[in-house]
């Protein structure tokens, strides 16, 4: 059993094919790069004598099999100050060649890329890598040659996420990384997040000019990053064309804004040819796809369980012709995975969104792809795979939510991850507007609440000042955050631009005269009720807290017609809202 649970198949960082080739060539003892790294780069860049000698000795072996640590190395808390201590680090120069080497995080990205395209193979038992036949052919191909490009296109054709991107672009639309990201991978979990494009564009339209570059370049979910990187590779191979996409955004009390998103893509004629071949819809044989157990979940707490469940679903489909969903459920149960049908449907949707062609006809599912053999690690020898409480909760919600899109179940995980604050606030605001039917705006940023929503056409139209918090251990509403909300409530009451020049309260139309405040998080603990009561006494405004689970359940009831926004208004009683 391996000591680490690696994640492969999804790449966010590297984009230069010339650097990818250098990484592959360190596995080819006859390449110039191998000798350069062994004889020049490592002796020059690796300052620790013991590590330097070990790496050179490893590269002198007859059979070049490198461990993950030998390739990627280690890091420090300050990434820019980490010393060079691994083969890939020494193989690629950093941007601007200031240090002469890259860090371990970037090295991991290049390793994943080489593995994703099938140039190297992972040996699970020893946590190591070896070059493949196609990797050796790529290493030996002349730089910039037709053969090199042919090898790259063949490799990308067997990489499911690349084919997924081409499939989404197939009808000729000009799609942004957000359009692509929301339909890529296993939406509904924190490893595959996508920012709501409409809310991002609205934020751009209302942002200060100095902040727009930061929003365009750095505001994205993990799936958006994957889409951006894959789109960049496809662009370099001539399979898609990248070009900015422009939008006209209405803004309150101002002329319409023209905004753009830089990372947007359209398929080319060459791309359509590659896609037709991948689908087996030409005279050529369908290109086999490489799928790895390690790509079937990324950031989940119980990713071993979920990866294995999804891998087994794929194996069941490989062995069968056409199966009903209930038959897949029965087969899974025999293998020790007792799952509701909605979870299996969600997994199959994720496999499709990963780039695997599965045909759905009514209740029948049929795999249309040729999948190369892949390994499901036997990790249950000492540890039985059991669903976590979180996975049980998600499974329960998939069964309950008939009207709410299941992609929003990801809020359950996102709300527990403090690094995902921005995604949480944007997704929550999108949910309030798309599912509940509130009007409003995502605000965020300095001296603004996360969002402002309001009703139109209710018996009593009301507005809500919204603050969201992603917190791992439950949110106790500390006094600092309560004081911040007090400030927003009072700013909305006085509406004095000398106190806050950004005038965020202009979101609310003059017809809205009753206001509430709301905190949204994963779950609440501690003395939050006392803070809500204190805020109510100071501001004479009623508020509440709302867990993301209750947010989802309330949305389901709204869509089912069993709850109205007026009934939601009456639940603001300075406590926790439960539906």
Swiss-Prot record:
Biotech applications: Adding the endonuclease domain C-terminal to different DNA recognition domains from other enzymes allows generation of novel restriction enzymes that are used to genetically engineer eukaryotic cells.
EC numbers: 3.1.21.4
GO biological process, one term: DNA restriction-modification system
Catalytic activity: Endonucleolytic cleavage of DNA to give specific double-stranded fragments with terminal 5'-phosphates
Cofactor needs: Mg(2+)
Listed InterPro entries: FokI_cleavage_dom, FokI_D1, FokI_D2, FokI_D3, FokI_dom_1_2, Restrct_endonuc-II-like, WH-like_DNA-bd_sf, WH_DNA-bd_sf
Signal peptide: none
Keywords noted in UniProt: DNA-binding, Endonuclease, Hydrolase, Magnesium, Nuclease, Restriction system
Subunit structure: Monomer, in which form it can cleave DNA. Homodimer when bound to DNA.
Domain remarks: Has an N-terminal DNA recognition domain (approximately residues 1-292) joined to an endonuclease domain (residues 389-583) by a flexible linker.
Protein name: Type II restriction enzyme FokI
Organism: Planomicrobium okeanokoites (Planococcus okeanokoites)
């Amino acid at each position: 059993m391996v000591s680490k649970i690696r994640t492969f198949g999804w790449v966010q960082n590297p984009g230069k094919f010339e650097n990818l080739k250098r990484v592959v060539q360190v596995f080819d003892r006859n390449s110039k790069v191998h000798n350069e790294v062994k004889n020049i780069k490592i002796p020059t860049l690796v300052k620790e004598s013991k590590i330097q000698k070990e790496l050179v000795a490893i590269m002198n072996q007859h059979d070049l099999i490198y461990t993950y640590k030998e390739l990627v190395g280690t890091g420090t808390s300050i990434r820019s100050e980490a010393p060079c201590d691994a083969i890939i680090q020494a193989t690629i120069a950093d941007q601007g060649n200031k240090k002469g080497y890259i860090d371990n995080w970037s090295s991991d990205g290049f390793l994943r890329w080489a593995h994703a395209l099938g140039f190297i193979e992972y040996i699970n038992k020893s946590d190591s890598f070896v070059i493949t036949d196609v990797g050796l052919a790529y290493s030996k191909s002349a730089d910039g040659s037709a053969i090199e490009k042919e090898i790259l296109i063949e490799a990308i054709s067997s990489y499911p996420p690349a084919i997924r991107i081409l499939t989404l672009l197939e009808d000729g639309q000009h799609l942004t990384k957000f359009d692509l990201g929301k339909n890529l991978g296993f939406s509904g979990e924190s490893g595959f997040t996508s920012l709501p494009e409409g809310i991002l564009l609205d934020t751009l339209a209302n942002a200060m000019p100095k902040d727009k570059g930061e929003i365009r370049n750095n505001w994205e979910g993990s799936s958006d990053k994957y889409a951006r990187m894959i789109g960049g590779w496809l662009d370099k191979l001539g399979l898609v064309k990248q070009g900015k996409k422009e939008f006209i955004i209405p803004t309150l009390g101002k002329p319409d804004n023209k905004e753009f998103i830089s990372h947007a893509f359209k398929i080319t004629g060459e791309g359509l040819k590659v896609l037709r071949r991948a689908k087996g819809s030409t005279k050529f044989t369908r290109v086999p796809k490489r799928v790895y157990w390690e790509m079937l979940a990324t950031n989940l707490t119980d990713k071993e369980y979920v990866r294995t469940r999804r891998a087994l679903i794929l194996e069941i489909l490989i062995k069968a012709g056409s199966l009903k969903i209930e038959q897949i459920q029965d087969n899974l149960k025999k293998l020790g995975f007792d799952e509701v049908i909605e979870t299996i449907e969600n997994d199959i949707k994720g496999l499709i969104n990963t780039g695997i062609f599965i045909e759905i006809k009514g209740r029948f599912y049929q795999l249309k792809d040729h999948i190369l053999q892949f390994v499901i690690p036997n990790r249950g020898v000492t540890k039985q795979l059991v669903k976590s409480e979180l996975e049980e909760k998600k499974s329960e919600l998939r069964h309950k939510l008939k009207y709410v899109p299941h992609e929003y179940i990801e809020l359950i995980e996102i709300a527990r991850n403090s690094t995902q604050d921005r995604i949480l606030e944007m997704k929550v605001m999108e949910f309030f507007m798309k599912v509940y039917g509130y009007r409003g705006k995502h605000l965020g940023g300095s001296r603004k609440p996360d969002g402002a929503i309001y009703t139109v056409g209710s018996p009593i139209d009301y507005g809500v000042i919204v603050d969201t918090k992603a917190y791992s251990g439950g949110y106790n509403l500390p006094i600092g955050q309560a004081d911040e909300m007090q400030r927003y409530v009072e700013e909305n009451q006085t509406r004095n631009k000398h106190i806050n020049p950004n005038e965020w309260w202009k979101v609310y139309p003059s017809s809205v005269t009753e206001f509430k405040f709301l905190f949204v998080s994963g779950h609440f603990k501690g003395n939050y009720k006392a803070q809500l009561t204190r805020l109510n006494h100071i501001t004479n405004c009623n508020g509440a807290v709302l867990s993301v689970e209750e947010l989802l359940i309330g949305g389901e009831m709204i869509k089912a017609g069993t709850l109205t926004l007026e009934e939601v208004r009456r639940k603001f009683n300075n406590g926790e809202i439960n539906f």
